[in-house]
UniProtKB/Swiss-Prot annotation:
EC nos: 5.3.1.6
PANTHER family: RIBOSE-5-PHOSPHATE ISOMERASE 3, CHLOROPLASTIC-RELATED
Highest rank taxon of the organism: Bacteria
Keyword Isomerase: yes
Reactions it catalyzes: aldehydo-D-ribose 5-phosphate = D-ribulose 5-phosphate
GO biological process: pentose-phosphate shunt, non-oxidative branch
Annotated HAMAP family: Rib_5P_isom_A
Main enzyme class: isomerase
Keyword Transmembrane helix listed: no
Protein name: Ribose-5-phosphate isomerase A
Binding partners and assembly: Homodimer.
Family label: Belongs to the ribose 5-phosphate isomerase family.
Organism in which the protein naturally occurs: Chloroflexus aurantiacus (strain ATCC 29366 / DSM 635 / J-10-fl)
Keywords recorded for this protein, A-Z: Isomerase
Taxon lineage: Bacteria, Bacillati, Chloroflexota, Chloroflexia, Chloroflexales
Length: 239
């Protein structure tokens, strides 16, 4: 029986996605523990001379700091026409390659970079797979301070429970934009796309953690190795 650890599986998925990186690419650098493996592997290939003229677009201030420490040249969305490939993690993935993201609080920038990308490779271990979004993970929402309790009440009126995300010291968690995060336990979602549209239309919600139709590739590391799933596989897979 294969007993590879979660961290080993994260690294396996990251390595499979990093194999897509080519010289001259603009690379979206995701945020989170799994994406950090990919960033380190990209830096290693860069310093080995395998990747020339690449530049990274970080999805969070934490990612930017790591990339600078590793010597990866950086740019911004304002300075590039498009991102060739983004490699990022996810908190939950359904068989349609729809995602819940935002566990690290970087959902707004992550979504902006993903939307600007020609290809989005999501890297996860098999614990992130779910038959329906919301089954395993709360849905993060970035909200403004003004009226956040009213926003929370509106969410709970739709069903489920809402918690304001706190730091370890008990103070409210703040995003890179200075906003708050509400974590909404809304249960399995029958129609994530419809909910995404509803949340996008609600004033006070800056961004939600539903990523619909953005992932082009999924690399899942499990006991039997890494499985590569693409959008062409949707409708033929289940987990």
């Amino acid at each position: 029986m294969n007993t590879t650890s979660t961290e080993t599986r994260k690294a396996m998925a990251a390595a499979a996605a990093v194999a897509l990186v080519r010289p001259g690419m603009v690379i979206g650098l995701g945020f989170g523990s799994t994406a950090a493996y990919a960033t380190r592997m990209i830096a290693e290939r860069l310093h080995q001379g395998d990747l020339n003229d690449i530049v990274g677009v970080p999805c969070a201030e934490g990612t930017a700091q790591l990339a600078r420490e590793l010597g990866i040249p950086l740019t911004t969305l304002d300075e590039v026409a498009a991102v060739d490939l983004t490699i990022d993690g996810a908190d939950e993935v359904d068989p349609q390659l729809s995602l819940i993201k935002g566990g690290g609080g970087a959902l707004l920038r992550e979504k902006m970079v993903a939307q600007a990308s020609r290809r989005v490779a999501i890297i996860v271990d098999d614990s992130k797979l779910s038959p329906a979004l919301g089954t395993r993970f709360a849905l993060p929402l970035e909200v403004v301070d003004f009226g956040w309790r009213a926003t929370a009440r509106w969410l709970e009126a739709q069903g489920g429970t809402v918690q304001l995300r706190l730091r370890a010291d008990g103070q409210p968690f703040r995003t890179d934009q200075g906003n708050l995060i509400l974590d909404w336990k809304c249960g399995p979602l029958n129609d994530p796309a419809a909910l995404a549209a509803q949340l996008s239309a609600r004033a006070g919600i800056v961004e939600h953690g539903l990523f619909i139709g953005l992932a082009t590739d999924l690399f899942v590391a499990g006991p039997d190795g890494v499985q590569h799933v693409t959008t062409s596989d949707c409708g033929t897979i289940a987990w």
